Structures are given as C-alpha cells and as structure tokens.
C-alpha cells in the first residue's frame, strides 16, 4: 500500500520567494486531505553576539525586543497565509482544516525535525536555500542538514 500523507510541515523562511513552495504544499494538502503546519524557526544568537547584547542592553529591553520580533514574525506568517488562502480560496475550500502556524526557537534544521516528529508529519517541505549571499550558490545549509538527517521524507522546492 502506498504511504498516506496526513500532515505536512512547511518550514517557511518568510522570504517573498516562497510562493512556489506554498502552492505545492497547499496542492498536496488538498490532494491528500492533509493538515498543514506552517512553521518558522528563530535561530538563537551565537555566543559572541549574545555576549555583546547582554553587555549593552538590559534584560527587560531584550525581552521586549524578542517579543516584538515574535509578533512581527507572527504577523508576516499570518499575512503570507492569508494571501495564499485568499488567492486560492476556491481551490482550497476543500481543505479539512485551516493551516496551523507555529514559531519555534532554536537552530532551524533541528527545530524542523523536532516539530515534524512532534506533529507526526509524513512530509517536510522547505525551500532549497535561504537568502544569504553565500547560500545562494548552493543548497541551503538548513535544507542540506534536514535532507541528510531526517527520518521523515523531505521535499525541497527550488527558489526561482
């Protein structure tokens, strides 16, 4: 028997070039009657940056900045999802449940795999690369790590 896709985790970097991947995710969800989890991972600062910030910014200000960043990411994810839902409302009216949005703290590759396991995902979808200069030349390091370490199938969508 062929495997059933019940849950799809789409690891979204909130770039403006995510349309192709989002279209594919929503198409797969519609075809398979799958639940969609749209997630974004907030990468922690490295030790040097963290020490510098801790030396110059109070904990109260740091917490406020983090809260603002999470609010901004939530807003961007909701906007991205709303735009797709509006654009494809007719085609997506058959989705059993509205996509869930999730923001997690941690290294992206590890967070993607953790969420996929926690949510019993059958498929992870992600873009081929991030928006950094060096990563534009090759497959993104996050996608590369997930591809090589995930026990869940990974679909990588090229950014055009």
Regions found by a protein language model. Give the residues of each.
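A short acidic, glycine-rich active-site loop
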Residues: 58-77
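Structural beta-alpha unit
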Residues: 1-3, 82-124
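General small-molecule cofactor/ligand-binding pocket signal
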Residues: 39, 100-104, 155
